[in-house]
Every structure is written in structure tokens, then in C-alpha cells.
Amino acid sequence: MFSNNRNRFFKCINDNSIALFYSGHSHYKSGDQLFPFEVNKNFYYLTGIQQDGSILILIKKSLMQKTFLFIPNINPIHKLWNDNQLNKEQITNISKISYNDIYEMKDFNVWLNQQICEFKSLSPKVYFDIPYYHKKYYCWGYEQVYKFLSSWPWIEIANSSPILLNLRKQKNNEEINYIKHAIDIHYHSLIYTFNNLKKCQYEFEISAHFHYFLEMQKAKNAFETIVASGKNALTLHYNKNNSKLNDEDICLMDAGVVINNYSSDITRCFPLKHKFTSIQNQIYDLVLNTNKILINWVKPEHSMQDLNRYGKQILAQGMLKLGFVEKIENYFYHSISHYLGLDTHDVLGISPEEPIGENSVISIEPGLYIEHLNLGIRIEDNIIVKKQGNINLSAKIPKEIAEIESLIIK
């Protein structure tokens, strides 16, 4: 898969070009403790390697394609303390990059200078991975632009990020199977959680049951799980998960599962101990109906902007029928969809006006948030957008009122 991804990228760049990608580096948490390493997703997409301090170089010269990888210097002492450094054999097996084209970082500067100088007469273009949010966070590619231009002012600089975003947007069968696997684990984790709901007195206990089951499947959470009961569901990214559960409340659970680096992102709402009340039922039914309509309505030629506009229209009309006359923005204040893949909010930087395209995996997540009712309802599914009819990958995860109530009452 990864060599094929590189070949697709090569087709998108100019001849006489060099593209560089950095895997990222570990960040200190406090003292000598590090945060868990999170690989740069474009680097991973092209290599399958999850190792910090590594640089991928792709060279297209006179229609020849070459791939090189530089990895951290091998340190025998480091290996006694950490098990996160892959050897060249392992890297070749995963990435299909030739063993002889993998070098240690100590050789990088001399090697790179030689390559650039060989290109001088060809007016080369050098691609760096510079995401649209590069000014908010440290960006290796952005930093390298200035270093390259100061050393080799005759080169032309280009951004590879838009190319990678468009390649990653449409998923191949292998990627879709990874997402299906994540959703399958999500389903079983959620059912396990429902089966243990009666034992729970606090939000964090619900979260704990979910995490226990998914970790037993060698998976991990894609983001901080949201378990928001009652008024807490009015806050979209509520993550304290520490409130005592109230039998009369609805609980919103927004969670994601990662396996093989691909994510699910699914939200379900359920009553605590009892059935939905009449007004809870009405609001839930409106959100559910909107969810179902949008799953079937969206087409590859539609944009995220189209999807959001139509979803808000359905919610607004429904709320008006229920007697809520204020503007819909008072009750719905987030996007109805996002792309899904290596990141939970995948390929950030794609224009919301751009067609979604076939074989994109997206979320469908309408919601309503009503402060005076202490009620937040969001129903989120993950679908593949297809010309001949979309596929709801999370269809088996219960969302009908009767299904939810039967699970709670058990």
C-alpha cells in the first residue's frame, strides 16, 4: 500500500523535483517524561513507518523515481531503554523502501548537499510538507524553507501538503478495511459499555468500560472520549467526564477507536436508567431523521458546504414544527461532517467548497443543543460516499430509540 501511495505522489509532482517529509519528533511532557509519539500522517501515508526523527526523500529526475529514508543514528544504549527504534530490515519490510536506500541521520547533510548540487543545472523544485495551520504549531517543512533558500537560493520551493491531502481524501480498499475494523471494535466496545451501564454512577465509569474493552482488542482511543450527561452535552468538546449521573438525563457519548492508524468517530445518545421522555424523544427523532436523510442524500459531487447547508435546513424546519422559533444557530453550532481516516478530522485544509468525491469516508453528525432542557443530542455515523449509493459503515451500531431503550433496560 505504501509504495503505491508513493507512486501516486510521484505522478503529481514535476520532473526534476525533490520532496522531503519529516516524521516528527517526541515532545516533552514534564521533567524527563515524553508525550506518546504521534507520527506525521503524510509521512506515514508514504512509508507506513512510525518512528520519530526520520526524513523521507523522494526524487524524480529525468523521469526516474528514487526513494530514500534517513533514520535516527543507531544507539545501542538507547535500545536498552526504549523499544521504539526500528532496524533497517523492519523498515524495508513495512515500507518496501530498499535496504540500501536507508541511511542514518549522521550522513544526511552531506548526502543532501550532494543531491541538490547535482540538480543545479536542472532548475529543481523542492517540495516541503507545510500544512495550512503551520503558523499555529512547529512545522519542520516551514523551517526548512528558509534554510534551503539561504544555502541554495536558486531552487524553487513548493508545498506538497495540498497534493497529499487530495490523495488521502479518497480511500483505497485497504484503508476502508482498516476503518471497518476500527468501527467493528467500536461497536463491541459500545455494546459492552451498555451492558455495564447499570453499574455506573459517574461519567468516567462509562468511559472506563468503553476503554477497557477497546484496549483488550489492542486498539486505543482516537481522541479524549466525551461522556457528557445532561447539561454537559451542551459543550461540544466536554471532556471532564466527572459528573454524577442523573437518572432523568440523556448521556451523549462521542468516541473514536484507532487500529492500524485508522479511526472511527461515532456518537450515540442514550437515557440513563429510564426511557426517553416525550420532549427528549421528539428532539432525538428530529436529529435521527436528519442523520438518515443526509446519509442517503450526499453525493460525490456535493461539497461539505452543501452538506452543512442542507443539514441545517432540515434541522431548522424540524425545530420550527416543534415550536422553537429562534434561529437554528442557537441550537446547532458545529459542522455536520468531516473527513475521516488517518486523522479523526482528516485532511484538514481541503476547501469546504470542494466536491467530496467518491470513496471519501466522512462523518454525518447532526445535533441539537437546548440549554433550558439540559439536553444535547448528536448522532454520528461514518459513511463511504459512492456514486451508486453511500455505505453506512457504522449501521450496526444501535441508534433507533427502540434499540437504545432495549439495551438500557436490560
Regions found by a protein language model. Name each.
Residues 1-410:
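Active-site neighborhoods and metal-handling regions in enzymes and metal-associated proteins
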